[in-house]
C-alpha cells in the first residue's frame, strides 16, 4: 500500500515566491536522500496561492524507514531551523494518507 505525505503552506505577505520554491528544493534533496519521491504543487483552485510539498512512498514500511532516517539526520534539523527562521510561509495543514486499491 502506497503512502503520501503532504505539507500545505501559505506564503506570508511580502514573501518572495522564488525564495519559497528554493527552500522547498532544499527540503526535497533531504527527503529524496531518504527514499521519498517528492513533488511540489501550486494550488490553483480552492486555497489559491498555497503550496503543497508532497512525498510519496511505495509502502508504509518505506515511509517509516524514511522518517527514522530523516529524524536522525542533522541536515533535516538544520533545514527545519533555516525554514522557520526565514519566515517565508505559514503552515496550513499536514496529511499522511494510505492508498486504497480499487
What are these regions (language model features)?
Residues 1-78, 82-102:
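Short S/T/G/P-rich N-terminal loop/turn motif that feeds into the first structured element of a domain
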Amino acid at each position: 500500500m502506497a503512502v503520501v505525505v503532504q505539507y500545505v503552506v501559505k506564503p506570508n505577505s511580502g514573501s518572495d515566491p522564488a525564495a519559497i520554491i528554493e527552500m522547498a528544493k532544499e527540503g526535497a534533496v533531504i527527503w529524496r536522500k531518504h527514499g521519498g519521491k517528492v513533488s511540489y504543487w501550486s494550488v490553483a483552485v480552492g486555497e489559491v496561492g498555497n503550496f503543497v510539498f508532497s512525498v510519496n512512498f511505495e509502502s508504509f514500511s518505506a515511509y517509516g524507514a524514511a522518517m527514522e532516517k530523516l529524524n536522525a539526520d542533522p541536515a533535516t534539523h538544520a533545514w527545519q531551523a533555516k525554514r522557520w527562521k526565514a519566515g517565508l510561509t505559514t503552515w496550513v495543514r499536514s496529511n499522511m494518507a494510505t492508498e486504497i486499491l480499487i
